[in-house]
Every structure is written in C-alpha cells, then in structure tokens.
Amino acid sequence: HSGATITLVPMDATTQTLLTHQDLTRLTACDHPLPQFVRETLRPWIDYSIRTRHLPGCWIHDALVIAWLLNQRVADGVDYHDDIELRPGATRGKTWRYRTPLRLDVGVPADAGALVHVMQNVNNPLLLEVIEQTFNGLKR
C-alpha cells in the first residue's frame, strides 16, 4: 500500500529461463573480471542443475529480474489486484490476486489490494542477449 510500482517475478516466470554451458561460454567470453567470476561461479551450478533437475542448463532467476530492469522487452506480464490476507485466522498470510472485473463474490472487496504487474512470459533468447551485451560493454 506504499504506492510504489511493483512487479512480481514468480517462479513460474523464472523457470522459463535457461542458461547452458554453451551460453555461459559465449556470454562470458570478454576479458573482464566480472564475466570471469560469473563463469567460474555458474559452471558448477549448471552441472548441479543438469544432474538434479535433468535440465540442459540452469535457471537464472536473479539475472532475469536485473535484465528486465535494463530492457522490459525481456518479459511481459499482466496487471492484477494483489494483497496479503492480514485478518486473524487460518488464512492469515495467504496471498491472493484477481483481475478486474471480478465476476463473482470471493469475499474480497472490489478494488482491494494494490495493482501489481505479474511477469508471465519470458523471452529467453533476448534475456541472454541483454546479459551478453551488458558484459561486452564493461570497461577494464
């Protein structure tokens, strides 16, 4: 209820990302300490994800958020009214969301909660391109 613009990036969105070993090699090819650190840090994580999640790489949750801040074409989303249940009882702490117009009574007053942009669809090739361009733009 702060009035701040909020974008929620749920796991449904971040699991649409994928970084493979081949991607990591290409993205971190420039000679700068930051991409080199990212390469060394992510290689074991990609291996772990391949073994445990049976994916061809790993998800890059935090990188998605930062890339989206740099280029909002990386992902799109939908606006929802969103809030957290604060009344005492079994549902306290539960989050809820709805889109207007709400067509049936669900015990939530109309226009309750804050308008929140919820990320839904990720353009993974563009995400990787934004990361690569950012790394390539680093000055030594």
Predicted regions and their residues:
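Conformational coupling and interaction surfaces
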Residues: 3-140
